[in-house]
């Protein structure tokens, strides 16, 4: 199976400026992500950035970097530019890995690529079961429901499916585990251009979830339970401190 990993990395971050270059045990965060992705068996791992500081650091550790426009409105537009600049064939599988996940397991990068290769969908992603009831009601924990074949029916920040009877009886809503979506995607490269030429849908604007555009226009997204539950990404200084402690062991 052939696939390419693209890792978007932006310097600007509201809560943690310069996040991709944050030092973690002697290496910048983006290098940790790059090295994890490189263990997944991809043909190529590319870091996409619009910042010369990140470009210089990536070249310094021997990584493959593609400079992109600073004017993209979404990460998907950035992917399209990388696919075009790097000459990635339309039938190639591209896995988008977030640049703030230094602990991402290589196994799930390969898993989502293989799931796409084995499916009829133009796009695939992963989920994990929700074990904590607080996540059921947390709008930042995006829920997903699928059909019998593992294709997404809907993604929502609300609690879906809603167990009416369990709620009425005061029972735990995790008895029949909900699925929490995790932010890793695999695409057939040619589908990216199709996607960015669609107008944003009403549903994605309401939920603030880009992937709903795919379902709105009648395409499929394959969803599987991740073989390994990934650690949380780095959004804050507290997150960064936790990752440093883990990798220092």
UniProtKB/Swiss-Prot annotation:
What does the sequence similarity comment in the record state about its family?
A: Belongs to the KdsB family.
Please name every pair of cysteines joined by a disulfide bond in this record: none
InterPro entries noted in UniProt = Cytidylyl_trans, KdsB, Nucleotide-diphossugar_trans
Question: What is the E.C. number?
Answer: 2.7.7.38
Keywords per UniProt: Cytoplasm, Lipopolysaccharide biosynthesis, Nucleotidyltransferase, Transferase
Give its localization: Cytoplasm
One GO term (biological process): lipopolysaccharide biosynthetic process
Chain's role: Activates KDO (a required 8-carbon sugar) for incorporation into bacterial lipopolysaccharide in Gram-negative bacteria.
**Which transformation does this protein catalyse, written as a reaction?**
3-deoxy-alpha-D-manno-oct-2-ulosonate + CTP = CMP-3-deoxy-beta-D-manno-octulosonate + diphosphate
To which pathway does this protein belong?
Answer: Nucleotide-sugar biosynthesis; CMP-3-deoxy-D-manno-octulosonate biosynthesis; CMP-3-deoxy-D-manno-octulosonate from 3-deoxy-D-manno-octulosonate and CTP: step 1/1; Bacterial outer membrane biogenesis; lipopolysaccharide biosynthesis
- Protein's UniProt name: 3-deoxy-manno-octulosonate cytidylyltransferase
One Pfam family this sequence matches: CTP_transf_3
Task: Output the Gene3D superfamilies linked to this UniProt entry.
Answer: Spore Coat Polysaccharide Biosynthesis Protein SpsA, Chain A
Q: Which GO terms describe its molecular function?
A: 3-deoxy-manno-octulosonate cytidylyltransferase activity
Per the record, GO CC terms? cytosol
């Amino acid at each position: 199976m052939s696939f390419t990993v693209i890792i978007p990395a932006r310097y600007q971050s509201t809560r943690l400026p310069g996040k991709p270059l944050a030092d973690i045990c002697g290496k910048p965060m983006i290098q940790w992500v790059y090295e994890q992705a490189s263990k997944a068996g991809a043909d190529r791992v590319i870091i996409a950035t619009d910042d010369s500081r990140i470009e210089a650091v990536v070249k310094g550790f021997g990584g493959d970097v593609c400079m992109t426009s600073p004017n993209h409105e979404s990460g998907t537009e950035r992917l399209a530019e990388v696919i075009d600049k790097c000459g990635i064939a339309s039938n190639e599988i591209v896995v988008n890995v977030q640049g703030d996940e230094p602990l991402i397991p290589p196994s799930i990068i390969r898993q989502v690529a293989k799931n796409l290769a084995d499916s009829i969908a133009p796009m695939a992603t992963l989920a994990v079961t929700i074990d904590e009831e607080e996540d059921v009601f947390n709008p930042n924990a995006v829920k997903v429901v699928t059909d019998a074949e593992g294709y997404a029916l809907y993604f929502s920040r609300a609690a879906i499916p809603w167990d009416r009877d369990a709620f009425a009886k005061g029972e735990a809503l995790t008895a029949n585990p909900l699925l929490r979506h995790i932010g890793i995607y695999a695409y057939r490269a040619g589908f990216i251009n199709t996607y960015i030429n669609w107008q944003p849908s009403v549903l994605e604007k309401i939920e603030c979830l880009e992937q709903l555009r795919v379902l709105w226009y009648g395409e499929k997204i394959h969803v599987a339970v991740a073989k390994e539950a990934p650690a949380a990404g780095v959004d804050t200084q507290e997150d960064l401190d936790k990752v440093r402690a883990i990798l220092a062991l």
